[in-house]
């Protein structure tokens, strides 16, 4: 579903990938390989058919892996700083912000997200919480937290670029840090649409996550077929 080339891209995928990957312990996480292909390369390949350009924020001194259809900039000191630089590096009217460490992005999720952005200007992929939640007291069971109405936020997230630039400028002026971009919009009173996500959009953060990603590649390489009815 590649859009025709224009001098000013309509939609851009922006991937902040300048993190150190401390918890995984294998160097910059975006460059960690799963079945011989980096997390970053997999994420770019998933998004590229649906956007006009892909821009990636990398650590200083690092280059994109060979063959990755994107352009690179130097990221900031934080994820929030990297996203701000990415926003300034594109002229696209609509942007998708995606974690490189979520390499398995089902096409139907991307399409649903794009529809939601067109309708509302701000949307994020998320999943209703299914697990029992408890607030711990030290190492002990504390208070049960009702899960009704709770969603686990994923990426990609999508926005009208000007809206997100305003939110980042406000956050910088107020020295406010958020864990994701939808949170920056929400604090300005912007309604962010929740788009049903997918369990395969988990974030590779720990060695256990990496093992799961390795197992999943046997189902996705060469096509997307991990649940009945999805096209290979």
Curated annotation (Swiss-Prot):
Quick check: keyword Transferase in the entry? yes
Keyword vocabulary terms for this entry:
Isoprene biosynthesis, Nucleotidyltransferase, Transferase
Report the top EC class in one word: transferase
EC number(s) for this protein?
Answer: 2.7.7.60
SUPFAM superfamilies attached here? Answer: Nucleotide-diphospho-sugar transferases
Signal peptide interval: none
Task: Indicate the family of this protein.
Answer: Belongs to the IspD/TarI cytidylyltransferase family. IspD subfamily.
**What does this protein do, in the record's words?**
Catalyzes the formation of 4-diphosphocytidyl-2-C-methyl-D-erythritol from CTP and 2-C-methyl-D-erythritol 4-phosphate (MEP).
Please name the PANTHER family in this protein's record. 2-C-METHYL-D-ERYTHRITOL 4-PHOSPHATE CYTIDYLYLTRANSFERASE, CHLOROPLASTIC
In terms of HAMAP family, this protein maps to: IspD
Protein name per Swiss-Prot or TrEMBL: 2-C-methyl-D-erythritol 4-phosphate cytidylyltransferase
């Amino acid at each position: 579903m590649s859009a025709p080339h224009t001098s000013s891209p309509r939609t851009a995928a922006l991937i902040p990938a300048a993190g150190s990957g401390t918890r995984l312990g294998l160097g910059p996480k975006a460059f960690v390989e799963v079945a011989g292909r980096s997390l970053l390369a997999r994420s770019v390949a998933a998004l590229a058919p649906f956007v006009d350009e892909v821009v990636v924020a990398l650590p200083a001194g690092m280059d994109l892996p060979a063959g990755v259809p994107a352009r690179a900039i130097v990221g900031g000191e934080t994820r929030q700083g990297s996203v701000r630089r990415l926003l300034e590096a594109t002229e696209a009217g609509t942007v998708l912000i995606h974690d490189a460490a979520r390499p398995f992005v089902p096409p139907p999720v991307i399409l649903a997200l794009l529809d939601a952005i067109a309708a509302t200007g701000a949307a994020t992929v998320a999943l209703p919480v299914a697990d029992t939640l408890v607030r711990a007291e030290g190492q002990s069971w504390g208070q049960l937290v009702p899960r009704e109405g709770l969603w686990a936020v994923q990426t990609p997230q999508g926005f009208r670029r000007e809206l997100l630039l305003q939110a980042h400028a406000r956050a910088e002026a107020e020295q406010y840090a958020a864990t994701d971009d939808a949170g920056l919009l929400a604090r300005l009173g912007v309604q962010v649409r929740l788009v049903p996500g997918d369990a395969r959009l988990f974030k590779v953060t720990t060695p256990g996550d990496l093992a799961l990603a390795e197992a999943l590649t046997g189902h996705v390489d060469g096509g997307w077929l991990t649940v009945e009815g999805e096209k290979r």
